[in-house]
Amino acid sequence: MQWQDHAIILGIKRHGETSVIAEVMTRDRGRHLGLVRSGRSRAMQPVLQPGNAVEVIWRARLDEHLGEFRVEPVTLRAARLMETATAVYGVQAMGALLRLLPERDPHPHLFDALEVILDHLHNPADAGELFVRFELAVLNDLGFGLDLGECAATGARSDLAYVSPKSGRAVSRSAGAPWADKMLLLPPFLGVEGNHAADFDSLAAAFRLTGFFLHRHVYEPRGMEAAAARDGFVQAALKALNPALRTLAGPNGVSA
């Protein structure tokens, strides 16, 4: 068995004295593990860092075996990703999200999105918005997609201001007004118009939105918590937009 694919390094685990088991996100074969011989060598260590883009050749006698990777560098961005808190936490948080998906399950759109986000992690506003959209895409692929295109009550596609915590569907401002205190806010940049840039308030609302549904549909049923890196990323992204922010609280909430 053999195949070749574009991949992004998610992490590594030591294996024996000189080798590692690499975890990568491939474009056409999903999240995949493989043994890299001499992966702890001086030549390979800089290549096998999270966030780097590589070309991998996987070989195994049988498809169900772990197999071995031969890894060639393509874009070594790991050093740059260590320069900001949003980048450090962002790489870890996206890896944790991808681990929610079955191994070897293809998600090419998530691979493409991951590459885009990795190249924008230096800009907190861009990184925050892209990360929220990434979380929405993961929710969708897990079978818990949100319907943000029209009002659940009226079918209207304009002035959408809320999301029902029960149905995960958008609600217009007028239809949701009587229950506004029980609704989740729909950030303007996630609306159908999509012509609003993310600012501090809308990004904080977006993190609450995705955090709520990830906790409800994924983490709680699996008896797990969100990765600490997500909280770190949320804090770093929002603090970059509002340096006066001191604390972030709760799995789904933000407090100043």
From Swiss-Prot:
Keywords assigned by UniProt, alphabetized: DNA damage, DNA recombination, DNA repair
GO BP annotation list: DNA recombination; double-strand break repair
Domain of life: Bacteria
GO cellular component: bacterial nucleoid
Function, as annotated: Involved in DNA repair and RecF pathway recombination.
HAMAP family for this protein: RecO
Family membership: Belongs to the RecO family.
Name used for this protein in its record: DNA repair protein RecO
Gene behind this protein: recO
